[in-house]
């Protein structure tokens, strides 16, 4: 006969036999070490003797699954064990210790559920818990299962060890019988149920009094299992049927009277009974899920608080939006505009902020090829009249932003001024800006005519007195916003190289300037800051030739 042992096993057997162990002792030791048909069961927990192996096979499989003290792992659905050793829960020990007929029926029901599909049983238990508003916490407290593992098993069908499933099924069978007994009690015993409920609450608060009403055997069980006393009561939970009724009533009346609340109590209890498949006359069997007038009152109070809180949030959001709408940004610029770090009262730019009926919008674009930057500024030319210069009007507002160009920051200027010539200069030259009053423009122009034209830009600063500014009475028939802008460039004209002079020429020939009478002269107005204009040296001659004209474009500034 060919031996099925490996060489290592043969060496071990030879070593045992050579050590003096006889064959009979070795066989007896093997019989003691080999697992019996009831794998995983401690023999002292069974009423039968270890020698009656044939009788052990006839016992229900439930006894072999409820002990769980064996170190070996079972096959099948036990592979998803969460890693912790799972002691036998008290509910299984209690059911195993009972020899009554009811306990035998419960064990048979648990065995039947263990033989079925675990996912089907999990869905059945989950539906029963939802029907009777049973929280998972109650199952965890009774069975000792892990909360996360139980939730995954009921919701997703996660595999669970057979011993744990036996504890879950035991709780399910006993809970079914408990709820059935509650609803099968007669209406006359409702008072006794109330007394018993009060007694249970008292025993929950003072568990030491429970031992006085117990017998010797029950006292020992209570001492051995103290965790049963610490189990919390089930918290009241509104069912879906009751919530639907209450929300419909809340739409009709947000603060019902006591009579209306009592009517809602009866309606909710009736719906809860129908949800559980029992007669509405057995509403007392709802137990902790029984709807009372106080619970209805609290529900309506909580809904009113929630509604008031939502309204407050909506009003806060609305007022915040209104605050932003009342303070819009009046300046329009490209994303390349960089704000100045100086305070608003030190900004050198000005803009017209007085609203007017007739407005002409124009724009100027500065293209810096060296820095690949595009700066676009927009301004509004409004009708300027002696009335608009009244000190009460906010004609000028120093809230403009600085425009960043290569070589340094420049203040915003009127849109009639085009400083495109800055793109032809070096960054070092753009810093050499000349500040001069209007009276010095003639001298600068005369000196530049005799010398070679240079590329140094000139800043013409109008004197602080408005005597240098001659306001123009704009015609009432101004351009509409949909008309073309003031500054237009023709590709074939030599003025295309100098957009500033082209804009000035168009302003002179434009029909928007009517022939006006001699404008009045104004006194010293030092409260208005100086207007800034940027031009180049090649445009000085034309600018000086226009200095005596009554229609100087500076009048629009």
Swiss-Prot record:
It is found in: Nucleus. Keywords: Activator, DNA-binding, Homeobox, Nucleus, Phosphoprotein, Transcription, Transcription regulation. Its main location: nucleus. Liver, kidney and intestine. Pfam families: HNF-1_N (PF04814), HNF-1B_C (PF04812). Residues 1-31 are annotated as: Dimerization. GO terms for molecular function: cis-regulatory region sequence-specific DNA binding; DNA binding; DNA-binding transcription factor activity; DNA-binding transcription factor activity, RNA polymerase II-specific; identical protein binding; promoter-specific chromatin binding; protein homodimerization activity; protein-containing complex binding. One of its GO terms (biological process) is pronephric nephron tubule development. The modification Phosphoserine is found at residues 49, 52, 75, 80. Residues 66-85, 324-370 are annotated as: Disordered. Residues 354-370 have a biased composition (Polar residues). Residues 1-32 form the HNF-p1 domain. Residues 231-311 bind DNA. Residues 93-188 form the POU-specific atypical domain. GO terms for cellular component: nucleus; transcription regulator complex. Transcription factor that binds to the inverted palindrome 5'-GTTAATNATTAAC-3'. Binds to the FPC element in the cAMP regulatory unit of the PLAU gene. Transcriptional activity is increased by coactivator PCBD1. Belongs to the HNF1 homeobox family. Binds DNA as a dimer. Can form homodimer or heterodimer with HNF1-alpha. Interacts (via HNF-p1 domain) with PCBD1; the interaction increases its transactivation activity. PANTHER family: HEPATOCYTE NUCLEAR FACTOR 1 (PTHR11568), HEPATOCYTE NUCLEAR FACTOR 1-BETA (PTHR11568:SF2). This is Hepatocyte nuclear factor 1-beta. It comes from Rattus norvegicus. The gene is Hnf1b.
């Amino acid at each position: 006969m060919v031996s099925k042992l490996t060489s290592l096993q043969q060496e071990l057997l030879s070593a045992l036999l050579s050590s003096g162990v006889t064959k009979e002792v070795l066989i007896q030791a093997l019989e003691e070490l080999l697992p019996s048909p009831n794998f995983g069961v401690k023999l002292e927990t069974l009423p039968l003797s270890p020698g009656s192996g044939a009788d052990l096979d006839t016992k229900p499989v439930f006894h072999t699954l409820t002990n769980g003290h064996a170190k070996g792992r079972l096959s099948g659905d036990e592979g998803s064990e969460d890693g912790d050793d799972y002691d036998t829960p008290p509910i299984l020990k209690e059911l195993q210790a009972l020899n009554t007929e009811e306990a035998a029926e419960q064990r048979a029901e648990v065995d039947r559920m263990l033989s079925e599909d675990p996912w089907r049983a999990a869905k059945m238990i989950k539906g029963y818990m939802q029907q009777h508003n049973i929280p998972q916490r109650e199952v965890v407290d009774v069975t000792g299962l892990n909360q996360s593992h139980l939730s995954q098993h009921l919701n997703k069908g996660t595999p669970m060890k057979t011993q744990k499933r036996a504890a879950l099924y035991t709780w399910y069978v006993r809970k079914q019988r408990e709820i059935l007994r509650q609803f099968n009690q007669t209406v006359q015993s409702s008072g006794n149920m109330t007394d018993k409920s009060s007694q249970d609450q008292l025993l929950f608060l003072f568990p030491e009094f429970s031992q006085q009403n117990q017998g010797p055997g029950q006292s020992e069980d209570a001492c051995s299992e103290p965790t049963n006393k610490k189990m919390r009561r089930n918290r009241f939970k509104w069912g879906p049927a009751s919530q639907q009724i209450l929300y419909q009533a809340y739409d009709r009346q947000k603060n019902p009277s006591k009579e209306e609340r009592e009517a809602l109590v009866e309606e909710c209890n009736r719906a809860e009974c129908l949800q559980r498949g029992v007669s509405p006359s057995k509403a007392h069997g709802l137990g902790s899920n029984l709807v009372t007038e106080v619970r209805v009152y609290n529900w309506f109070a909580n809904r009113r608080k929630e509604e008031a809180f939502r309204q407050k949030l909506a009003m806060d959001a609305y007022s915040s939006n209104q605050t932003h709408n009342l303070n819009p940004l009046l300046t329009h610029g490209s994303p390349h505009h960089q704000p100045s770090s100086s305070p608003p009262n030190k900004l050198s730019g000005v803009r017209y902020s007085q609203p007017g009926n007739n407005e002409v919008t124009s724009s100027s674009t500065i293209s810096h090829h060296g820095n690949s930057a595009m700066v676009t500024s927009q301004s509004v030319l409004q009708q300027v009249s002696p009335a608009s210069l009244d000190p009460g009007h906010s004609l000028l507002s120093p809230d403009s932003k600085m425009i960043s160009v290569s070589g340094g920051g420049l203040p915003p200027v009127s849109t009639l001024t085009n400083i495109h010539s800055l793109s032809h200069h070096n960054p070092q030259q753009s810093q050499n800006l000349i500040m001069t009053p209007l009276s010095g423009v003639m001298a600068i122009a005369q000196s530049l005519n005799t010398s070679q034209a240079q590329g140094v830009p000139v800043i013409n600063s109008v004197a602080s007195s408005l005597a240098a500014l001659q306001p123009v009475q704009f015609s009432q028939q101004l351009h509409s916003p949909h008309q073309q802008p003031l500054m237009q460039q023709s590709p074939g004209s030599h003025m295309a190289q100098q957009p500033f002079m082209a804009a000035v020429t168009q302003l002179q020939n434009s029909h928007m300037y009517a022939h006006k009478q001699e404008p009045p002269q104004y006194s010293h107005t030092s409260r208005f800051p100086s207007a800034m204009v940027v031009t180049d040296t090649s445009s000085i001659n034309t600018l000086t030739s226009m200095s005596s004209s009554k229609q100087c474009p500076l009048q629009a500034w």
